[in-house]
Amino acid sequence: MKPIKEIADQLGLKDDVLYPYGHYIAKIDHRFLKSLENREDGKLILVTAVTPTPAGEGKTTTSIGLSMSLNRIGKKSIVTLREPSLGPTLGLKGGATGGGRSRVLPSDEINLHFTGDMHAVASAHNLLAAVLDSHIKHGNELKIDITRVFWKRTMDMNDRALRSIVIGLGGSANGFPREDSFIITAASEVMAVLALSENMKDLKERLGKIIVALNTDRKIVRVSDLGIQGAMAVLLKDAINPNLVQTTEGTPALIHCGPFANIAHGTNSIIATKMAMKLSEYTVTEAGFGADLGAEKFIDFVSRVGGFYPNAAVLVATVRALKYHGGADLKNIHEENLEALKEGFKNLRVHLENLRKFNLPVVVALNRFITDTEKEIAYVVKECEKLGVRVAVSEVFEKGSEGGVELAKAVTEAVKDVKPVYLYEMNDPVEKKIEILAKEIYRAGRVEFSDTAKNALKFIKKHGFDELPVIVAKTPKSISHDPSLRGAPEGYTFVVSDLFVSAGAGFVVALSGDINLMPGLPERPNALNMDVDDSGNIVGVS
């Protein structure tokens, strides 16, 4: 690894905007972005994927490798990524810093506590929860209805025992007993707010708008009513600054914020993306899960808020994912199966068609695994060419930037100045926005709203939230809301079970299917593979 000062020098960053965290990590003062406003923006490359298998398809690895490969062919590039969540790192998924020869460094530190941003978000979130219950205990001047408190508590850990709890037991000295729950920190609205805020003023305004409860008159109670947004911002004072690290080949990487891609928008901070676009020719960023979730939200929501638009999209696919969506069993996924591959290719086709609806040039990155056969690779390449889409076999995991040269060249040939196309208008009612997304992206035949969802729609209209963008929270395991429907389901009924407003983040969340905001640990969590020796060397994290 290079000292972080050398990485900063590549970007022209002076010491007065750099806050080092040891030798290899630094934060960049978020106010530095304003000094760059007269610079021309570089190209923005959005990396997304087909519907993933449980193991993931290498989207982060591809993003890192593509950025390194762009630098290799003489194009100045920065990769921007979300911060890993500690819970999944210790649980089933493992770390989120790429893999093989395409990683961000120092991987262990990034995957674990990093610069403390997750802790800051959790602290701000839980401060609000504590102040809310304290207000109720000490007279409840705002007349908060304890049966209509929406704000949960948070922890950056997978712990299913905390999904449903009772607080305030043990007598009046401990407050009022009521049901509560914990969510993982990445699902906190504070995380979404931090990722969307462009400066401290914006951050405090967004925090103040967060809805925490209803009072006994059925009126909304916000953070600003409790007067705690200033203290929450104090706890987030350093977390608003993007984190600078490097890849395995010394390419600069900005890693900042980590909102979930189902309950929120699933990409790194707007500050990091805009800063990278000012400092490089090509910014490579990724959106969580498949293109039906992350990419749609990036374009319909994040791009609108940030004032930018991708110049191209990279659709990451793997032979194993396509075989899985063609009916192959995960136990036999590494065996050649052209029939399953042919059937599963329909999943790639749907995601490609969806991306093209946004007027985006698309490059398919076929992330090669050692078990892929030549026949399987050739089939995917041939079918992509039939669809008129550029395709490049990517081997950045095994070969680093050398394995992504073909992909980098395809991306530079594909990029163009794109006229933004959004699927819905902001003045469309929420119900119509959901129907557009369900039919255009998820390929549903019709949309059904539960009675709970219908009541939520009335609340949304009554309180003036109908013109907010929509974030659909559904399973990432299928294009539909049903995780058992692999491949390219269509014509089904898309069921909306409930809706709620994230007023600070500025969107309405539509829930479809079972959405769990506090993951649990598997039978054998990744934590069992971790250890540290007497010299402080960590094993088993990434």
From Swiss-Prot:
Swiss-Prot/TrEMBL keywords: ATP-binding, Ligase, Nucleotide-binding, One-carbon metabolism
UniProt keyword Nucleotide-binding, yes or no: yes
Enzyme Commission number(s) of this protein: 6.3.4.3
Record InterPro entries: Formate_THF_ligase, Formate_THF_ligase_CS, P-loop_NTPase
Signal peptide start-end: none
Top EC class, one word: ligase
GO MF terms held by the record: ATP binding; formate-tetrahydrofolate ligase activity
Keyword RNA-binding among UniProt keywords: no
Catalytic activity of the protein: (6S)-5,6,7,8-tetrahydrofolate + formate + ATP = (6R)-10-formyltetrahydrofolate + ADP + phosphate
Entry superkingdom: Bacteria
Pathway this chain belongs to: One-carbon metabolism; tetrahydrofolate interconversion
Residues annotated as binding ATP: T53, P54, A55, G56, E57, G58, K59, T60
Gene Ontology BP terms: tetrahydrofolate interconversion
HAMAP family on file: FTHFS (MF_01543)
Entry's family note: Belongs to the formate--tetrahydrofolate ligase family.
Stored NCBIfam families: PRK13505.1
Protein name: Formate--tetrahydrofolate ligase
Gene transcribed to yield this protein: fhs
